[in-house]
Amino acid sequence: TFWGFSTENFRERAHMELRSIFSLNKKAIELLYALNRKKWNLRFRVIGNMKRLPGDLQKMLKTCERKTKKNTGTTVIAAINYGGRDELVRVMKKMIKSGNPVSEKNFAACLDTAGIPDPDLIIRTGGRNRLSGFMPWQSVYSELYFTDTLWPDFSEQELDKAIAWFRTIQRNFGK
């Protein structure tokens, strides 16, 4: 999962800055989609509150999801206008509207990530030792790796370090 920007970023940023962020997100999606068609067989999913995004970005994201829906490779999730609190509020609204009984199973079925396994490892770049509202429900048993490296400088070698660290962890899932 790549966190393109948060709901808080959406509320706090100036219009011109948001346009730049949207443009960068579109370029990244176009690049990933083009590379994917050639060799990776990735499946794309988008999480977040899409309703507030520009129409062309919404269309691009929906098209990318639709065209890769049957791919069998790794699932790549783009968190666009995503915030953990926002997701939890949207889940509660769906639950109330559905009338289904409140249960962990029904709650999880309403999450943006329904049908996708919870993350095993979350890597936080930029020297911040917090999740900033990233997947509060899904991250309960995730291992957290924090690095001072900024996202633009996060290299394949940095990823290898994080994965090597993860492999040393004895996971107990609350036991």
What kind of region is each of these model predictions?
Residues T1-K175:
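Flexible, compositionally biased loop and terminal segments
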